[in-house]
Amino acid sequence: IKMSSLGDILHTLPFAAALRQRFPKAKITWLVHPQFAGFVPDPPVIDEIIYFDKVKFNKMNLLAKLAYFVEMRRLLHSKKFDLVIDMQGLFKSAVLAAISGCSNRIGYCEMREGSGLVSKAVCGSHSKDHVIERYLDVARYLGAEVREIMFPLPDLSKETVSVQEKLQKNELQGEYIVVVPGARWKTKEW
């Protein structure tokens, strides 16, 4: 479970790659908000994506929210997971881990908002290092040998063609560096 945000999803990619290397025949499912699903790696790294639509959920009344959770519980139970890994470590991910039907639940060391009551926190030797290393500590706990940090990005060939077509259409040539000077939170704009 790693539902958001963009940077957090990208930081989790090396964990997903290490998990796939450790368990090459496992079926690995990722639970994510739909707006970030395009950054979840394609097969063979991730086999299936389950969506939790936070935008839609936040617009629901209480009864509709309960129905949404009942449906999500049914879906998660139907998967019969052997292990649930909560890489989000927040209340919302803890609830989803709890209703998954899987009793074997772990998460990375920095679990907050009560998520540590639902899943076992896995802390490794990189607790003071970059979050990527802290996520990889969970993979190491599961027996992965992390020799290099890999970022299994999804196939972006269609997007590449689209950008190339737009550059040609606008008669722009050469190499470019694209800068997106923005952030979702004001505190992250510097």
Regions found by a protein language model. Give the residues of each.
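Catalytic machinery of carbohydrate-active enzymes
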Residues: 1-190
